[in-house]
A protein has these predicted regions:
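A conserved regulatory-domain signal marking ACT and ACT-like small-molecule sensing domains
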Residues: 1-92
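Flexible, glycine/charged-enriched surface loops at secondary-structure junctions
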Residues: 39-44, 81-83, 184, 211, ...
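Glycine/serine-rich phosphate-binding loop and adjoining beta1-alpha1 elements at the start
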Residues: 80-263
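General beta-strand structural signal in soluble alpha/beta enzymes
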Residues: 80-83, 183, 209-212, 233-236, ...
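Glycine-rich phosphate/diphosphate-binding loop of Rossmann-like nucleotide-binding domains
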Residues: 152, 159-177, 229, 235, ...
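Adenosine-phosphate binding glycine-rich loop
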Residues: 232, 236-237, 256, 365-474
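Rossmann-like adenosine-cofactor binding region
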Residues: 314-384, 389-391
């Protein structure tokens, strides 16, 4: 599918052009004829003979941006100056910082913020460790932990290259939920080492957000940390995705008039996200689900599963899905299905496959940047279509969930996170979309809807209290 110009590949080009003539119209024509989009044009200096103009341009890729620059370079009378990649400019020096809540202006301030006054606070915590939540940043802090092994669609790029993503995650925590999140990029991909490191740093945090850790190690790491720690551990790639998918599916079913217990769901992808989505859907009431991976439909008799370990994710899928014992390919499995959910690879389905689904079909094609099926083609026969992309309606985006989930967990001083809390989060997110707003192109709210984080946080907080998972200490 063609890729439209995006702000992700936005650049500002400084040009000098003749003050008279058609140079300005020529450069806008050159950009648009090259497939780019002029999003801003600012005159930064003017004279009788020359104009200096900063042109902001959206391209579809770095190669496309280079092509546009070369087109501009070829315009007669135009002198090309500095070309700035706006995304890289935003990352210069990092995107986040630590800031003090109290000014340190004199010796009195210094004596209370640091020595000697701080010693009294330290001793108070030593006598009552629970006071760390009340007297330190712990109560509002989340560690965003990665080993860089499964970063976005980039793969195993390592901890340093993963840092910009973790910084971005921390910025989103602050923007949408007021949470102080700290990027922790570990230079090891050893499961035991990661578990021990996170256990060692846990005293400084009220929650752990695991991020971009490859499957199947992510399952073991999360399970062991949940067992060992008295703070919630949440692998967002699994559970954040699952919560948003369930919320979107809830509203898609409202659009189509189908009941969750009566639908047949076919999923493509049995990795971290796929497994978590499946578990949450089953907990929400789905009775009939089939999963396919690169080897085809997952079923108990499949050759590669006969000797699979009982505790493995794929074995669990085989034991808990595909009640009809289907075999074969994804394309065969999707025939007559009510719902398709893809968390796998581009273009595994086509328009004919979607047309072969049940009436009122729901298609969630979430692979990025290229979905499992072209959304424009899927819309020709499906009743509701969602993707992971921001340039189509119904974007399934984890930003809708993780800030509110952790806000609720931290406010409740929860010691864990469980399925009931995630179900509550999904229901709250779905309910942000009112009956008057609901339609096939609006089943999930915008990340900038100011009701989202509060609604999710409130639901998670109440679910944590109901589960008896909260600490007994009070906060001022």
């Amino acid at each position: 599918m063609a890729t439209a110009p995006s702000v992700s590949y936005s650049m500002t080009v400084r040009l000098e052009v003749p003050a008279s003539g058609t140079a300005v119209s020529q450069l806008t024509t050159a950009v648009e004829s090259s497939g780019g989009s002029v999003t801003g044009l600012d005159v930064t200096a003017s004279g009788h003979e020359k104009l200096r103009i900063d042109v902001t341009i959206a391209a579809s890729s770095t190669a496309h941006a280079d092509e546009i620059v070369e087109e501009l370079r070829g315009i007669e009378g135009v002198t090309l100056g500095k070309v700035s990649d706006r995304t890289f400019l935003m990352h210069l020096g990092g995107k986040i910082e630590m800031a003090s809540k109290h000014p340190i202006r004199n010796r009195d301030d210094l004596s209370m913020v640091y020595t000697p006054g701080v010693a009294r606070v330290c001793m108070a915590i030593a006598e009552n460790p629970e006071d760390a939540r009340r007297l330190t940043i712990k109560r509002n802090s989340v560690a965003v932990v990665t080993d860089g092994s499964a970063v976005l669609g980039l793969g195993n790029i390592g901890p340093k290259a993963a840092l910009p993503v973790m910084e971005g995650k921390a910025a989103l925590f602050k923007r949408f939920a007021g949470i102080d999140a700290w990027p922790i990029c570990l230079d090891t991909q050893d499961t035991d080492a990661i578990v021990e490191i996170v256990k060692a740093i846990a005293p400084g945090f009220a929650g752990i957000n695991l991020e971009d850790i490859s499957a199947p190690r992510c399952f073991e790491i999360e399970a062991r940390l949940r067992e060992a720690l008295d703070i919630p551990v949440f692998h967002d790639d699994q559970h954040g995705t699952a919560i948003v998918v369930l919320a979107a599916l809830t509203n898609a079913l409202r659009v189509t008039g189908k009941a969750i217990e009566n639908i047949r769901v076919v999923m493509s992808g049995a990795g971290a996200a796929g497994t978590a989505i499946l578990k949450l859907l089953l907990a929400a009431g789905v009775k009939n689900a089939v999963v396919a991976d690169i080897h085809g439909v997952v079923h108990a008799g499949r050759e590669d599963l006969v000797d699979a370990a009982p505790g493995s994710a794929l074995r669990w899928i085989a034991d808990n899905t595909n009640l009809e014992g289907l075999t074969g390919t994804l394309k065969e499995a999707v025939r007559g299905a009510d719902v398709f959910i893809g968390v796998s690879a581009p273009n595994v389905l086509d328009g004919d496959d979607v047309a072969a689904m049940a009436d009122g079909a729901i298609v969630f094609a979430l692979a990025n940047p290229d979905p499992e099926v072209d959304p424009a083609i899927a819309r020709q026969t499906a009743a509701v279509v969602a993707t992971g992309r921001s340039d189509f309606p119904n974007q399934i985006n984890n930003v809708l969930v993780f800030p509110g989930v952790f806000r609720g967990l931290l406010d409740a001083q929860s010691r864990t996170v469980n399925t009931e809390m995630m179900l509550a989060a999904a229901t709250a997110l779905a309910d942000v979309v009112t009956e008057d707003e609901l339609n096939p192109n609006y089943i999930i709210p915008s990340v900038f809807n100011d009701k989202v984080a509060g609604a999710v946080a409130g639901a998670v907080r109440e679910a944590a209290k109901a589960a008896g998972a909260t600490a007994t200490t009070s906060q001022p």
